[in-house]
């Protein structure tokens, strides 16, 4: 069986070109690694822990005096390389469909604490070396994109006194996420795409971070997201398998500026994107892509998950979102227990690997030592409209090679007491990128539908 020691690199994709400027295109790029652990058990445990931390942050989404994104460090996430400034500076940024605000490490004095690499080894944008870099003004409407409750009449007092040529800047941001934070100054800069320059692109110039060595390219549904600022009507990606994490292989990201209003991509199964719930006093849930997961089957047998768990209520409790920034798929305790128990009850050929379960926090795990071909019950997700996602084994079981034995673990997580009591609010299911390996995934923003098909992405 393949060793997991290479399973946790950050794979790099490069996006194509924005709306109304070009036709869609794709460009492959290289890989980089910031995983802090070399031991496979520590790596697997770390992924499980950070997947839970990210899920807790997504579920606890709320407006605050500071801007918030939904990212955690060392997640096994995928990234894109974007070029900003005049002359251009290329910066790797994590592809995140669970948040909208984009930011990058900024200035030569950028400090990253509790990171796996030193601050000097992190790619940072240098505003002084760009003639097009501008700090965002306080009266600029985009300041309200950063601070959702922002009121320029009360926050920009200097500009109220000095109506013309006001130099007051948009307030700094503090971004909170599952296991850390980042902070900096909002700015507008030229985004350099392969054949076009997009001026005045809103991006955060982060001066410090904790536990976050790379910036974020926000692909959520908010007005500050990259697709929204570029007017993209459709974007898609294909995530290469994590087994290629130690190779130059990469997937791709494509952004389509000229999407036909009704045309479907060949051989894709589609399910409607659901209307985002509105939690009282907050618009934080508006970034997420909700889809209608209607049924889960294990080995062809329906898992008896309640409708209330799979459908969001008016307060944003329950439902399913797609999140490229999460590694392992998260399920609320009630949903997870039914799914994991279904595997435990149906798998009779292999013994439970309880030591591995205690070491990693994943369950169930099975000892498959001596078996050339591992067989597990099929896992299928059934969506609204009839779309079915039949998953290959590598997308829902993680292989761990020990010196003495070979073990596979269900690559899904649920909340636990390590980070406090379980949060029952927010989405019940968060579909992570491990589940989407070797799937062509499409976000049709015009028609509000989510499409997918299985294919090789390498």
Model-inferred region functions:
Residues 106-109, 226, 336-343:
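Short active-site loop/helix that positions an aromatic residue
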Residues 99-102, 109-111, 209-210, 243-245, ...:
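Solvent-exposed loop/turn segments at secondary-structure junctions
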Residues 162-170, 178-288, 403, 407-457:
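Aspartic protease core domain of the pepsin/retropepsin superfamily
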Residues 2-40, 74, 85-87, 95-100, ...:
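Aspartic protease catalytic domain
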Residues 2-93, 101-185, 247-252, 261-291, ...:
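Disordered propeptide/prodomain
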Residues 179, 195-196, 300-302, 386:
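Detector for glycine-centered tight turns/loop "hinges" at secondary-structure junctions
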Residues 99-103, 216-219:
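FAD-binding core of FAD-dependent oxidoreductases
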């Amino acid at each position: 069986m393949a060793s997991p020691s290479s399973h946790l690199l950050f794979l790099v994709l490069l996006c194509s070109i924005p709306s109304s400027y070009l036709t869609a295109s794709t460009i492959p790029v290289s890989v980089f690694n910031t995983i802090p652990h070399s031991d496979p058990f520590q790596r697997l445990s770390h992924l499980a822990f950070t997947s839970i931390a990210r899920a807790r942050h997504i579920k606890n989404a709320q407006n605050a005096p500071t801007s918030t994104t939904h990212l955690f460090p060392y997640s096994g996430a995928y990234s894109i390389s974007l070029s900003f400034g005049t002359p251009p500076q290329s910066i790797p940024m994590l592809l995140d469909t669970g948040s909208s605000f984009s930011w990058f490490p900024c200035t030569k004095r950028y400090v990253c604490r509790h990171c796996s690499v030193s601050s000097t080894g992190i790619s940072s944008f240098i505003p002084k070396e760009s003639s097009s870099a501008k700090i965002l003004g306080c009266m600029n409407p985009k300041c309200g994109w950063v601070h959702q409750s922002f009121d320029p009449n009360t926050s920009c007092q200097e500009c109220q006194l000095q109506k013309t040529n006001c130099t007051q800047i948009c307030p700094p941001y503090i971004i909170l996420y599952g296991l850390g934070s980042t902070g900096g100054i909002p700015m507008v800069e030229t985004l350099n795409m392969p054949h076009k320059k997009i001026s005045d692109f809103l991006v955060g110039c982060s001066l410090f971070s904790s536990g976050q060595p790379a910036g974020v390219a926000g692909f959520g549904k908010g007005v500050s997201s990259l697709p929204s600022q570029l007017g993209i009507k459709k974007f898609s990606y294909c995530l290469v398998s994590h087994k290629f994490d130690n190779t130059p292989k990469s997937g791709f990201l494509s952004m389509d500026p000229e999407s036909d209003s009704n045309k479907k991509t060949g051989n894709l199964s589609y399910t409607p994107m659901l209307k985002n719930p509105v939690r009282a006093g907050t618009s934080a849930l508006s970034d997420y892509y909700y889809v209608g997961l209607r049924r889960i089957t294990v080995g062809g047998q329906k898992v008896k998950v309640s409708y209330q768990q799979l459908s969001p209520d008016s307060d944003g409790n329950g439902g399913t979102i797609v999140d490229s920034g999460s590694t392992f798929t998260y399920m609320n305790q009630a949903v997870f227990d039914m799914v994991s128990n279904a595997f435990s009850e149906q798998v009779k050929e292999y013994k439970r690997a309880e030591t591995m379960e205690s070491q990693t926090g994943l369950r169930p795990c099975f000892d498959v030592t001596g078996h050339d071909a591992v067989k597990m019950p099929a896992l299928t997700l059934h969506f609204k409209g009839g779309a079915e996602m039949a998953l290959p084994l590598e997308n829902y079981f993680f292989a761990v090679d020990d010196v003495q034995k070979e073990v596979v673990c269900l690559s899904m997580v649920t909340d636990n007491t390590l980070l406090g009591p379980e949060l029952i609010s927010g989405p019940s299911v968060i579909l992570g990128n491990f589940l989407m390996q070797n799937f062509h995934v499409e976000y049709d923003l015009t028609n509000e539908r989510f499409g997918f098909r299985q294919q090789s992405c390498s």
